[in-house]
Amino acid sequence: MEFAFACRESLNPSYMVCVSAEGKAARACLMKENRILSEVWLYNLDSAPEAGETDETYNKNAAEFVAEKKFVIPKSKDQIAVRWFRLNGAVLASIYIDEVLHATLISNELIGRCRLAKKNGPLAKVLKLLV
């Protein structure tokens, strides 16, 4: 299922998260005034390659970086929600898929964090949940 959408922060509409699931992978970008501040890989749209693909616009994350977690690819954008926070002066966008925290983007970190990341890589960092 391919889709793309944007969600603006209500208190400061100059910030926006764009989510796209097109081509080979899904990703999200935190933007301010059309400038990317942070981006993160969300999931591959099919199996992970052994070596990372680096020449495509929407890169698939390589198997070495993808955790072996059960994950159902969303069928529509309605399954994805963005929640906004402030963290030590930075803007934090939390991305939920089916009401489960899936990824975070912080305005002062170029690469975001994703729960499907097994180890830090060029497309996503590990999302550590504090419970």
Language-model segments: which ranges?
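Structural signature of eukaryotic scaffold interfaces centered on beta-propeller domains
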Residues: 1-13, 18-22, 74-88, 129-131
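Surface-exposed loop/turn elements that mediate protein-protein interactions on large endomembrane-trafficking
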Residues: 1-3, 28-75, 102-127
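Exposed beta-strand and adjacent loop surfaces of beta-rich binding modules
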Residues: 25
